[in-house]
Amino acid sequence: MSGNTIGKIFCVTTFGESHGEALGCIIDGTPPGLELSCKDLQYDLNRRRPGTSRYTTLRREPDEVNILSGIFNGVTTGTSIGLIIYNHDHRSQDYSDIKNLFRPGHADYTYEKKYGIRDYRGGGRSSARETAMRVAAGAIAKKYLNEKYGITIRAYLSAMGNIKCPFKSWQEVENNPFFCSDPEKILALENLIKYLKKIGDSIGAEITIIAENIPVGLGEPVFDRLDADLSHALMSINAAKGVEIGDGFSVINQRGSEHRDEITPQGFLTNHSGGILGGISNGREIVLKVAFKPTSSIRKAGNTINKNNEKVQIVTKGRHDPCVGLRAVPITEAMVAIVLMDHLLRFRAQCSGK
């Protein structure tokens, strides 16, 4: 009911706030026998970690994960896996001036109206800091899917503002702080971020995720369609405002003769559907795009109200990302992995004997 859990067989429950003592999660449903250590989770956590680039937030957190349960002699036991990450570099005093104000574009207003109380320090539970535990849980799913089924899940920055970044190379994605696959776009991205920092503003971004070697049959129509669950998971990420699957919204300009993925004995000729038909994976790569809004915490003064419903001006202090898309790549990968892991285990439970 409280919306802190995702999944039916592979279940992930997260807890913690941006400026609380720690972040944590419980992962239930991991099959036994998977070799797993903190090192397996730390790689993706380091990719998401704040303070690793001059282009992201200056908050510096080691994000070192500890495994509390579910592992014995280096392998999963099939019981619940408990993970925890302690917060270190939180500066709650940065938010003391706005504790009675509602930051426009944030969850301050809606949390206050819904619960009658909110943690104003860094956004509390609504902060993107919460996604660290999703990345840790997603790393477990990614490892299992890859080792047992050869499934790979990778993402890259495909647009920042009006800078389009077409795919060029997966190797290049990990060679720059933007997760951009096109080296020719790096200078333009750098200049844009520098300019935004100078004027105290922010920009939106688009992330593309591609999952390969997906077996046919994942997804449960009607209400648990694979594309519906993937959209739900991706839209649950902070600042996500839109999801496209396959050709997405460009289908409105296509004709049926163009969009349909014709089939031959060798397989599908095209992949306009993004690897999902009728809510079920068709064996082609799953292609997704997520649009992220500009960061709402900026230095530019803006209009808002306080708790007394009085009109005021607000300038948000603190340490914030000029573009949340820069750290969204491992988060989107994690959410796709969690959904695919859950659906694969559900498929195995229902259809393994056919």
Curated annotation (Swiss-Prot):
Superkingdom of source? Bacteria
Protein name listed in UniProt: Chorismate synthase
Q: Which Gene3D superfamilies match?
A: Chorismate synthase AroC
The EC number(s) given in the record are 4.2.3.5
- Which GO MF terms are attached to this record? chorismate synthase activity; FMN binding
Q: Which PROSITE patterns would you find in this protein's record? A: CHORISMATE_SYNTHASE_1, CHORISMATE_SYNTHASE_2, CHORISMATE_SYNTHASE_3
Q: List the disulfide bonds.
A: none
Cofactor binding mode and count: Reduced FMN (FMNH(2)).
Q: Which GO terms describe its cellular component?
A: cytosol
UniProt pathway annotation: Metabolic intermediate biosynthesis; chorismate biosynthesis; chorismate from D-erythrose 4-phosphate and phosphoenolpyruvate: step 7/7
Organism, by scientific name, is: Buchnera aphidicola subsp. Acyrthosiphon pisum (strain APS)
Give the quaternary structure.
Answer: Homotetramer.
Annotated FMN binding sites = 125-127, 238-239, 278, 293-297, 319
The job of this chain, per UniProt, is described as: This reaction introduces a second double bond into the aromatic ring system.
Top enzyme category: lyase
Q: Which UniProt keywords apply?
A: Amino-acid biosynthesis, Aromatic amino acid biosynthesis, FAD, Flavoprotein, FMN, Lyase, NADP
Cofactor(s) recorded for this entry are: FMNH2
- Listed NCBIfam families: aroC (TIGR00033), PRK05382.1 (NF003793)
The residues that hold NADP(+) are: 48, 54
Q: Can you state which reaction this protein catalyses?
A: 5-O-(1-carboxyvinyl)-3-phosphoshikimate = chorismate + phosphate
Which family does the record claim for this protein?
Belongs to the chorismate synthase family.
- Does the UniProt entry include the keyword NADP? yes
Set out the biological process GO terms recorded for this chain's protein. Answer: amino acid biosynthetic process; aromatic amino acid family biosynthetic process; chorismate biosynthetic process
